């Protein structure tokens, strides 16, 4: 599901820049990868990314979402030497930060997983109703 953090008087750009995100991949085969990403290490700052995405050249009257990505790219071999890393079905992937919480997903085939019917309208309706 989505992970959204809105800026307000308790959380601003400097807070976002100082975040460290932990990533963990755990497999049924005993595989465990961990990594830490420092948002401050991104190659382009938030203001630079926003200025490239918004202006007369790209107009979004209703706003937009800025996805900054992650610095984590596993290079360890998983199944055989020289083949690199690939997810297996059942892998549990978690991205977490003490301030933001955690996003946890299990790798599966889309056609075999429950339908993702919780969309943006329901999310914002729940936010408006004070549900979490």
Please tell me what each predicted stretch does.
Residues 2-3, 8, 76-132:
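Charged, cofactor-coupling segments
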Residues 1-50, 120-131:
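Glycine-enriched loop-and-adjacent helix/strand subsegments that border the catalytic/binding cleft
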Residues 25-27, 36, 64, 69-70, ...:
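Active-site proximal loops enriched in glycine and acidic residues that flank catalytic Cys/His/Asp
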Residues 28, 55-58, 98:
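Generic secondary-structure signature for well-ordered alpha-helical cores
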Residues 48-87:
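A conserved acidic, glycine/proline-rich C-terminal tail/linker
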Residues 32-35, 58, 104-106:
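Extended hydrophobic-aromatic, low-complexity segments
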């Amino acid at each position: 599901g989505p992970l959204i953090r809105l800026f307000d008087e308790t959380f601003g750009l400097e807070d976002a820049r100082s975040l460290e995100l932990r990533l963990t991949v755990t497999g049924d085969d005993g595989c465990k990868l961990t990594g830490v990403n420092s948002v401050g290490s991104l190659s382009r700052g938030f203001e630079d990314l926003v200025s490239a995405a918004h202006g007369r050249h790209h107009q979004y009257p209703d706003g937009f979402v800025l996805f900054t990505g992650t610095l984590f790219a596993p290079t360890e071999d998983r199944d055989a030497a020289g083949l690199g890393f690939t997810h297996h079905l059942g892998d549990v992937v978690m991205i977490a930060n003490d301030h933001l919480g955690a996003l946890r997903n299990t790798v599966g085939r889309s056609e075999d997983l429950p339908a993702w019917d919780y969309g943006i309208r329901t999310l914002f309706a729940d936010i408006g109703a004070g549900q979490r």
